Swiss-Prot record:
Heterododecamer of 6 alpha and 6 beta chains. The basic functional unit of phycobiliproteins is a ring-shaped hexamer formed from two back-to-back trimers contacting via the alpha chain subunits. The trimers are composed of alpha/beta subunit heterodimers arranged around a three-fold axis of symmetry. The phycoerythrins also contain a gamma subunit which is located in the center of the hexamer. (2R,3E)-phycocyanobilin binds at residues 83-87, 115-124. It comes from the Eukaryota. Keywords: Antenna complex, Bile pigment, Chloroplast, Chromophore, Electron transport, Membrane, Photosynthesis, Phycobilisome, Plastid, Thylakoid, Transport. Signal peptide: none annotated. This is R-phycocyanin alpha chain. Belongs to the phycobiliprotein family. Coiled coil: none annotated. Pfam families: Phycobilisome. Contains one covalently linked phycocyanobilin chromophore. InterPro entries: Globin-like_sf (IPR009050), Phycobilisome_asu/bsu (IPR012128), Phycobilisome_asu/bsu_sf (IPR038719), Phycocyanin_a (IPR006246). One of its GO terms (biological process) is photosynthesis. It is found in: Plastid, Chloroplast thylakoid membrane.
Length: 162
């Protein structure tokens, strides 16, 4: 899994050299942001149930057909609603994993790689998850550097889905 730290080390090691000043600055920058990133991951994890529930309701409000159409890919039943919440939770977990490692590696490796195929196979609309992530971003209750760190990866997920 790629992170800014592993990429800097891999680049230096592949060339048989020590880290350059630029690479050390990248590493230092990550350490400077690490506390805020970990605080964001903790807060999102602690509030996950509330955020996921609110995000699902935001999807149902913006796309009411998702609760009216029958079928396994819609939220017209309790099982469908549980699947929607599970999927939103997956995106939120990926955001927290990115916060912990300080890079998009987890999202790139576990989400982005097969995202288009999954959405096509199960007839899932990326716009549902974009709406859910926007809700999470606007309602996570974080501020300052902690919010900036969280929003970086939420925005990355939104852009990936767009």
């Amino acid at each position: 899994m790629k992170t800014p730290l592993t990429e800097a080390i891999a680049a230096a090691d592949s060339q048989g050299r020590f880290l350059s000043n630029t690479e050390l600055q990248v590493v230092n920058g990550r350490y400077n942001r690490a506390t805020s990133s970990l605080e964001a991951a903790k807060a999102l994890t602690a509030n996950a149930d509330r955020l996921i529930s609110g995000a699902a309701n935001a999807v149902y409000s913006k796309f009411p057909y998702t609760t009216q159409m029958p079928g396994p890919n819609y939220s017209s039943t309790a099982i469908g609603k549980a699947k929607c919440a599970r999927d939103i939770g997956y995106y939120l977990r990926m955001v927290t994993y990115c916060l912990v490692v300080g890079g998009t590696g987890p999202m790139d490796d576990y989400l982005v790689a097969g995202l288009e195929e999954i959405n096509r196979t199960f007839e899932l609309s990326p716009s549902w998850y974009i709406e859910a992530l926007k809700y999470i971003k606007n309602n996570h209750g974080l501020s300052g550097d902690v919010a900036n760190e969280a929003n970086t990866y939420i925005d990355y997920a939104i852009n990936t889905l767009s």
